[in-house]
Amino acid sequence: MKPRIMMISMKSNLRTMRYIGLLLMFIFCLTAQNMMAQRGKLFNSDNQLSSNLATQVFQDSNGFIWIATRNGLNIYDGYNFMVIRKAYNNCNGLNSNYINCITQDEKGRIVLGTNKSLLILNGKRFCNVPMLDSRNKPINTYVTQVSRLHNGDIAVVTSGYGIMTKKIDANACYTMKGEVENLKYIHKILEDKQERLWIILENGKLLRKEKNGKLVSRIMGTEQLNTQDIRQDNKGNIYLATKNDGVYLLKAGSTAFTKIAGIGNLPIDNIYISRDQRLFIGCDGMGIFVYNPVTGFLQNNP
């Protein structure tokens, strides 16, 4: 892997870490209410969590919360944490403590992206999923995001090798074919309810892969934006976060993004839509803001 690839991804993840500890508290309150009767609680390395450098929180179909960190994998059952780290005898199959992202496939298996591989949990052991480039040669690369698509495939976002896919019964992960194959440095993706794939490049440009495979590079309202994150609510509205120009909204059925005036020009890193459809906004050096799309009210560090 080229050093530039690793540096770009690490820089992006370090920005995320500046507020992710606070975000854990809110996500636990919002996604695990059935497991936690008490008020929100902040977890950190002094209180059960294996590291303060956390990159993703994921709730599986059984309600368990999985937390990816730079020092192992954490599993929370509503009462206690279990920490899984790389073992010297490789008994658990975890080949790195540097875990970036988590999702779950259609069979209920946990899928992890690390700094050098893709792993899948088979029973009680993680197994490596071979990653093959466009020439079908095996690679080891930095996985920045894993996401389950509507057709059941797992989309694997990498830094340097573009988007790859793992089919549900496949034993390997392959480069996504079509026009998107030419994209290499990708920051984040989102598949919307129409099965279109929104792609944020590491340079902040937003693209869209249509269901027929065609790649759209001109998206109205985003021409000059440095985009950071993208989410869709349960009504089909798409929120687009930018680096220094606030949040833009693509209403369901619309063709152009428009700026949400009430949010202003916040320096945004990540956004998250809660179950009650509020927008949680993580900002670089400014903590968390919460935007209510019904009232238009923006709350600072609730």
Question: What is each residue range found by the language model?
Answer:
Residues 1-302:
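Carboxylate-rich, polar loop motifs that coordinate divalent cations or form catalytic acidic clusters
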